[in-house]
């Protein structure tokens, strides 16, 4: 399943998101959700321990001035990669 986090993790039921993640799922951080991938925040360690790959939309990182502050564990992607993820996963959950 593809999970997309478009809101700040501080304004989302992040614990519920983590509970619903399964091995093989993927999470895309976009819009204000990219803040979850910033080094040093309380949500990043939870994402590191999850059995998933985590991506961040590069355009949203740039728009928020976060390109140099994002963790190396987060994979920056462009819109073409975003489309590939949506095609790859038949089910999606937006947060």
From Swiss-Prot:
It comes from the Bacteria. One of its GO terms (cellular component) is sulfurtransferase complex. SUPFAM superfamilies: DsrEFH-like (SSF75169). Keywords: Cytoplasm, tRNA processing. Its main location: cytoplasm. It is found in: Cytoplasm. GO terms for biological process: tRNA wobble position uridine thiolation. NCBIfam families: PRK13510.1, sulf_tusB_dsrH. Heterohexamer, formed by a dimer of trimers. The hexameric TusBCD complex contains 2 copies each of TusB, TusC and TusD. The TusBCD complex interacts with TusE. PANTHER family: PROTEIN TUSB (PTHR37526:SF1). This is Protein TusB.
């Amino acid at each position: 399943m593809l999970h997309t986090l478009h809101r700040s993790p501080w304004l989302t039921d992040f614990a519920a998101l983590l509970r619903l993640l399964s091995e093989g799922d993927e999470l895309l951080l976009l819009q204000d959700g990219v803040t979850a991938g910033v080094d040093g925040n309380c949500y990043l360690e939870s994402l590191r321990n999850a059995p998933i790959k985590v991506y961040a939309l590069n355009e949203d990182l740039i728009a928020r001035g976060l390109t140099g502050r994002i963790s190396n564990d987060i994979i920056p992607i462009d819109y073409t990669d975003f489309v590939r993820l949506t095609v790859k996963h038949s089910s999606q959950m937006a947060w």
